[in-house]
Design a protein with these regions (language model features):
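Intrinsically disordered, low-complexity terminal tails and inter-domain linkers enriched
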Residues: 197-246, 467-511
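Low-complexity, Pro/Ser/Thr- and charge-rich linker/hinge segments at domain boundaries
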Residues: 139-157, 288-303
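Extended acidic/polar, glycine-enriched regions
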Residues: 110-112, 173-208, 235-293
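Short strand-turn-strand beta-turns centered on an Asx-Gly dipeptide
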Residues: 85-91, 187-188, 277-278, 301
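Short aromatic-centered micro-motifs
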Residues: 82-85, 184, 274, 298
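Accessory beta-strand-rich segments of carbohydrate-active enzymes
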Residues: 3-17, 30, 46, 51-154, ...
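Active-site mouth of glycoside hydrolases
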Residues: 98-111, 127, 131, 257, ...
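Surface beta-strand/loop "capping" patches
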Residues: 149-176
């Protein structure tokens, strides 16, 4: 599909303050323009900004020629509870603020006329995050346009089958049956070209090569994989999970001559150009084989790799939450220059621009899904929506990550104390298995705070099986109430909405009346406790026997056990659980060298 920039000529208007609309270019973080006040309900987590709901509008001409075309609008990130309207009709809704999504415009456009697209981003429902989230359409937007015969978005999937000899598999989805061609290039020079045929998914001919200039691939050679003539696991999974209009695909298995492998020191990148009819899609990929096991840890192309990683959040400092390729690359460059070779997207899926930077620079990525499951850490966070959306969210994260050699694992969450309870242990397994069905080439982890899991299991904080059920119900109730309030506040998509912090924001610092000291709850309880007891006590606490009891079942439901602040458990657990692969998913900076010594 043709990808068209859709970032210019937008107008932004605040719905929670009486302000005039102003022109913006995406990406745009509306929170940066807000006043700050000590009465901010999001407090320091959002930099004492007041929060607000915003309306983005853009008028654009839709030509008559689009009548017979497939047109999607992609938003890489809207924070949060994004609503998309086209010519006054609601076309899409996406509650999670960190996953990209596509809006199908069929039935909404008026052809040969000016059209209006309107996006509402709600962030007056504070607090809803433990870190600065930004507000609005803070990542880029694009139009994707295609004719009758096209390759859908995320329709080209590339994986390495082996590195010695170098062999790759390319699966191409199409909207119709027909001939398609692939051209593999390295640094602008052609490596090989093949022509194949896309047929209905499940058809025995959908992996037929018509012609090839690859000496190791003969014309009409069948490239089926697996035993007994079965399709590869990837093809079977793709057929099952395919939810796009495309029902056709071609599968290519190609030997790459004189391959230049991808690793942290030599991040060699290839391009794959797939042509189907008049549609052309170009994907960048690297040839690298990832293996993980308890005996050697993790290897890339047969070489053991010790991760020297950092957790980082998605914002770009004074630039706010906006995603700019230059800023994303700058972060990775600084880390790389200081000896890091891996990063963790704490605690949300990272941007496409960041993945591109990691690919180019040889930085390994652990892409993380979410900071909260079904129990609140803040009052209006994602707990209320996760049950309905986690599968779609994970699918979109995998689609984004799949062709990037830098992505070496997925994380299903951060310090989700639900993993100490039966319901959470089951969800751990469900998420792991679902990710395996989407991508069998990468391991799955989850960052668990070992000591806090134990505390939650004895009722300190908000977590227990009974409380989990109640909190999950309350989460849905709170989300419904918040949505109801927002509907009442924005009656005609334009009437002013008001909250306490907004009113006080107009008056500078607001009321000077002393407030009652709040009792720490939820995540705040654990953060307060950590500050009081200190890092050494936390690490010692993690060695308690009950901590093992409250984490072992969840760890058994993932490929790699994520230890947050569990450095004192490593040697003991490696002996007790010889088949467990441990990742230091989070720790104190001063322990970095000790981690390195243990890992070696």
């Amino acid at each position: 599909m043709q990808k068209i920039d859709f970032n210019k000529d937008w107008m932004c208007r605040c719905l929670t303050r009486d302000e005039a609309a102003y022109p913006v270019t995406l990406p745009h973080d509306a929170m940066l323009s807000e006043p700050r006040t000590q009465e901010s309900t999001g407090e320091g987590n959002i930099g004492w900004y007041i929060g607000g709901d915003y309306e983005y509008t853009r008028n654009f001409f839709v030509p008559e020629t689009y009548k017979d075309k497939k047109v999607l609008i992609e938003f890489e990130g809207i924070y949060h509870n994004g609503e998309v309207y086209i010519n006054g009709k609601k076309a899409a809704y996406r509650p999670y603020g960190y996953t990209n999504f596509y809006v199908d415009t069929e039935g909404f456009f008026q052809y040969g006329k000016e059209n209006e697209i309107k996006v509402i981003a709600r962030n007056a429902d504070q607090p809803n995050s433990r870190w600065y989230p930004g507000t609005g359409i803070y990542r880029p937007a694009y139009l994707h346009v295609a004719g009758e015969k096209y390759i859908p978005v995320n329709g080209v999937k590339i994986r390495t089958l082996s590195y010695d000899p170098a062999k790759i598999e390319v699966v191409v989805k199409t909207s119709a049956p027909g001939e398609l061609s692939l051209k593999i290039e390295f640094e602008g020079s052609k490596v090989l070209r093949v022509i194949g045929e896309s047929t209905k998914i499940g058809n025995v001919n959908n992996d037929k090569i018509i012609s090839s200039d690859n000496k190791n691939m003969q014309p009409n050679e069948s490239v089926q994989t697996g035993k007994n003539g079965q399709k590869s696991e990837l093809a079977q999974v793709e057929a099952e999970k395919n939810n796009q209009a495309a029902e056709y695909q071609a599968i290519f298995q190609l030997d790459v001559p004189n391959a230049k492998l991808w690793d942290t020191e030599h991040p060699n990148l290839y391009t794959c150009k797939a042509v189907f009819g008049e549609d052309e899609v170009t994907e960048t990929f690297g040839i690298r084989e990832l293996i993980w096991n308890p005996q050697v840890g993790m290897t890339i192309n047969g070489e053991r790799v010790i991760l020297r990683g950092a957790c980082f959040h998605h914002d770009n400092g004074v630039l706010g939450a906006c995603t700019y390729p230059e800023a994303e690359e700058r972060k990775m460059r600084i880390l790389k220059e200081n000896g890091y070779n891996a990063v963790r997207s704490a605690h949300y899926p990272c941007s496409k621009a960041l993945l591109d930077a990691c690919d180019r620079m040889g930085m390994l990525m652990m892409d993380e899904y979410v900071d909260v499951w079904y129990i609140h850490k803040t009052k209006y966070d994602y707990a209320g929506q996760l049950a309905d959306w986690w599968k779609q969210d994970l699918k979109d994260m995998v689609d984004k990550d799949y062709n990037h050699p830098s992505v070496i694992m997925y994380s299903t969450g951060n310090e989700v104390a639900e993993t100490a309870q039966k319901k959470g242990i089951a969800l751990t397994g469900d998420m792991t298995n679902y990710l395996h069905s989407l991508d069998s080439t990468r391991p799955v982890t989850c960052g668990i705070n070992i000591f806090f899991n134990f505390l939650s299991s004895i009722g300190l904080g908000v977590y227990s099986d009974d409380k989990a059920e109640k909190s999950a119900g309350n989460a849905e109730k709170n989300a419904a109430q918040a949505a109801g309030k927002n509907e009442k506040k924005v009656v005609k998509s334009g009437e002013k909405t008001v909250n306490k912090a907004t009113e006080n924001g107009k008056k500078g610092l607001g009321s000077t009346k002393p407030e009652k000291k709040k009792k720490p709850v939820g995540s705040e309880f654990y953060n307060t406790l950590a500050c009081l007891v200190g890092d050494y006590f936390m690490k010692c606490g993690a060695t308690l026997y009950p901590c093992d009891l409250r984490t072992k079942d969840a760890y058994a439901n993932m490929d790699i056990a994520g230890y947050n602040y569990g450095i004192f458990r490593y040697k003991h657990d490696l002996k007790k659980y010889p088949n467990r692969l441990i990742l230091g998913s989070e720790t104190f900076c001063k322990d970095a060298y000790s981690f390195w010594e243990i890992a070696q």
